[in-house]
Amino acid sequence: HLREPGFSYKETIRTGTLAAAHGGFAHVAAMPNLNPVPDCKASLEEELRRIRESACVHVHPYGAISVGQKGEQLADLDAMVPEVIAFSDDGKGVQSESLMREAMEQCRRLGKILAAHCEDNRLLRGGYIHDGAYAKTHSHRGICSESEWGQIARDVRLAEETGCAYHVCHVSTKESVSIIREAKRRGVNVTCETGPHYLTFTEDDLQEDGRFKMNPPLRSREDRDALIEGLLDGTIDMIVTDHAPHSREEKARGLEKSAMGVVGLETSFAACYTSFVKPGVLPLGKLMDLMHDAPMRRFGCGTELAIGQPADLTVFNLSESYVVEPEQFLSMGRATPFAGVTLTGVCKMTMIDGKIVWKEETL
């Protein structure tokens, strides 16, 4: 979420792409919860103009599924096809089954992926953290797991019926993993992702602090373990940052009132390397596939290294550790559950199209 245009007090294209370079990412996909929403050619062109002016890494914009992301009327998908990586209303679930079916039919016709934030508003009931032990013992309103997996089950059925290429954003529950695993066995064209925070933290780690609040929320140990199992057996195709910056004020209101979302561009690789490669859970090559190759394959972006061609390269020191200090981030967002955690794997340099766009001062 690069937040520009419309929410530049949270993040800008410049600061967000600098954060990406600092974290070792050469390509990022920009979600459409902007103002104006990229739901037609004109609003998308405004976003593209700003990307051309300010981005220091490759930015691939999403087009919105619905007009204004209101979930009522299909956006002008045809007009946006040449410039968008996929279509999504990320940040909101598409509540209407008929609209989702129409969107999938159009995406199949256009040869584009539909990526969904799955959340059934009827089941939210004002919740803002996982509906588990912590919510009950600390008198918080919980978000039930079914609000996610119920909509995934609906969408998988629609994808099977329409033949749409369907992608599930930020999976967080064990039921979601099971539904997607079974869909893949049936041959449904579905992929999914999760984020480092869902693979690392659970509701047991919650504190009364906005840096632990995101959507979907941190779930139970069982859910976290199911996500890891999904990585190992191939059900979960990729790990993404779900970088969602907010202002300092918006994240300083505790669990109940803080905005939902945490930053991730500058910690994601190191967090996953520390949790999975160092202890031998995953080989480095598998992590690279989850964070780089698989997204490139699915979404059709990026280029391969070739002699004589401008290169996108990232240099990491995999033996160097550091303590996460959010005040050192290049992102305007500071809220992360990894604050104060020691991680291994430091990005030393990022090169885009043969030009160094970020490097450590001591390099």
Model feature map: region roles:
Residues 1-54:
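Metal-associated gating/positioning segment near the N- to mid-region
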Residues 1-11, 32-34, 60-73, 91, ...:
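Active-site mouth loops of central-metabolism enzymes
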Residues 254-257, 307-362:
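C-terminal cap of metal-dependent C-N hydrolases
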